[in-house]
Regions:
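A short, flexible loop at the N-terminus of ABC-type nucleotide-binding domains that lies
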Residues: 1-4, 13-26
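Helix-to-loop junction immediately C-terminal to a conserved catalytic motif
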Residues: 55
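ABC ATPase NBD coupling module
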Residues: 18-21, 72-89, 119-120
Length: 127
């Protein structure tokens, strides 16, 4: 069976005028469909950077990344957004609900950006 996530020789470098920070260097990772994976390590070791790339919020400096068998390095912004909306879920360590919305409205919000989903169906999913 094809891996859900396959990363080969991934590198991520952050640049400023004076400093070059290597956040990831030669990362190899394969995650199968239905597999549970935990990442741990000290602050600054690259966990958040790797997860941001896996979640299509950032791009690697070098290396190969395939999600469901398709290369994602060169996807346009709109396609990356569509995949994030329909195929990837995020659970943040610190969450920020929108204070002017109810809890149900906060839960429903991501579904409003999913095309073709009727309001009544969204509300039923939230409940």
């Amino acid at each position: 069976m094809q891996p859900l996530i396959e990363i080969e020789a991934m590198t991520k470098v952050f640049y400023t005028e004076e400093i070059e920070t290597h956040a990831l260097a030669g990362v190899h990772l394969t995650i199968g469909r239905g597999e549970y994976v935990a990442m741990s390590g000290p602050s600054g070791c690259g966990k958040s950077t790797l997860l941001s790339i896996i979640g299509l919020l950032d791009t690697p400096t070098a290396g190969k990344y395939e999600l469901n068998g398709r290369p994602v390095e060169n996807l346009k912004f709109a396609e990356r957004s569509r995949i994030r909306n329909q195929e990837i879920g995020f659970i943040f360590q610190s969450f920020n609900l929108i204070g002017d919305l109810t809890v149900a409205e906060n839960v429903e919000l991501p579904l409003t950006y999913r095309s073709g989903m009727a309001s009544s169906y969204r509300k039923s999913r939230v409940q």
